[in-house]
Regions:
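Conserved N-terminal diphosphate/IPP-binding helix and adjacent helical/loop segment
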Residues: 1-67, 71, 75-90, 146-149, ...
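All-alpha helical catalytic cores of prenyl diphosphate-utilizing isoprenoid enzymes
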Residues: 3-15, 28-35, 98-99, 118-214
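Structural motif
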Residues: 28-35, 52-53, 165, 220-227, ...
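Small-residue hotspots
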Residues: 42, 59-61, 68, 101, ...
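Structural helix-adjacent loops and short alpha-helical linkers that scaffold large soluble proteins
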Residues: 52-54, 119-123, 187, 240-248, ...
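Acidic, Mg2+-coordinating active-site segments of isoprenoid diphosphate-utilizing enzymes
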Residues: 71-91, 104, 109, 113, ...
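Short, charged, amphipathic alpha-helical segments
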Residues: 126, 130, 191-194, 249, ...
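C-terminal charged capping/lid subdomain of soluble metabolic enzymes
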Residues: 267-315
Length: 315
């Protein structure tokens, strides 16, 4: 569906969108990135008794919104690569990348409004758009908090979890609540399911942070090099000695970080069991999200969704 839409446009702007999505211009040696949010939405529709063949525009919508966030994130972070190839801004420059990202956002809203009105009422369509916009706005709030934390060493676990739930979890909440709305569930259930995304986001972000620090790929460390506060660091700060806090401060207050600075951080994390603390919080967040789904959905529906989310979170 995304390919058909973008191929129907002649302006080179849409070639940029195709490039970012891996539809055209992808190195033959690379694989197209998984559309986790779109797949999750469709999986949820099926699990909740809806018809996935009718909700493809909504799946396209959530993927376009995610792409919008990715493009802007790459510009903000100065990330030169995305999914194994040069990032969009690295090829076309930040100004055109911002145009492309904003275009993705507009397409996301138009796509969900184009769902078949022979099967969905105006009220249902507008409700789905509302959950899309709600997810976008909360994501922006989380990204604001994330950037604000970069120059601070006194970030709390509570503040981090709020940020991660907003920044990373809101689109998962949107995907699930849109699926519930399009499957005929009432507003209260949809709102509860949206809230589960907050904890999915916490778990997902903590997992990514663990990979940033202990993963083997140096190109995965862009967030560390940009001084973003990763959860293991935030978790150990609460019990760190003054000398350990100074050691971390010496790293994070440097003008420019290098890969070698991670060694100093790892010493403190190893002493204070940072990886263990992060793993425990990951499990807590994941279980909280799953409990919300179990409490608000029939057993067969929640079990199917939880299996899908387990797969996404463990990637």
């Amino acid at each position: 569906l995304m390919k058909d839409y973008l191929d129907s446009k002649s302006l080179p702007l849409y070639d940029m969108l195709s490039y970012h999505l891996g539809i055209h211009g992808l190195d033959p040696g690379l694989t197209v990135p998984k559309r986790n949010l779109g797949i999750l939405l469709q999986t949820a529709v099926k699990a909740l008794g809806g018809n996935p063949s009718l909700t493809l525009p909504a799946a396209m919508s959530i993927e376009m919104l995610n792409a919008f966030c990715e493009i802007h994130d790459d510009v903000q972070s100065g990330n030169p690569t995305r999914n194994g190839q040069d990032s969009l801004w690295w090829v076309w420059g930040p100004a055109q990348a911002i145009n492309a990202g904003d275009g993705m956002h507009s397409i996301a809203r138009l796509s969900i409004l184009n769902i078949d009105r022979n099967h969905f009422s105006d009220n249902t369509a507008h409700g789905a758009v509302s959950f899309l916009d709600q997810g976008a706005l909360v994501t922006f709030e989380g990204r604001y908090r994330d950037l604000e934390m970069q120059e601070r060493i006194d970030t709390t676990v509570e503040a981090y979890l709020d940020m991660a739930g907003q920044k990373t979890g809101s689109l998962y909440g949107s995907a699930l609540s849109i699926a519930a709305k399009l499957s005929g569930h009432d507003e209260k259930v949809c709102e509860k399911i949206f809230q589960s995304g907050h904890f999915i986001g916490q778990a997902r972000q903590i997992k990514l942070d663990i990979t940033q620090i202990w993963g083997s790929e140096s190109d995965q460390r862009i967030d560390f090099l940009n001084k973003k506060k990763l959860f293991p660091v935030v978790a150990v700060l609460e019990n760190a000695t003054p000398s350990q806090k100074r050691k971390l401060g010496d790293v994070y207050f440097k003008r420019v970080l290098e890969d070698s600075d991670l060694d100093s951080v790892l010493e403190v994390l190893d002493d204070l069991e940072g990886k263990k603390l992060a793993t425990q919080q990951y499990v807590t967040a994941k279980n909280t999200a799953f409990s919300i789904l179990k409490e608000n959905l029939p057993d067969h529906s929640s079990e199917h969704l939880i299996d899908s989310l387990e797969t996404i979170l463990e990637e």
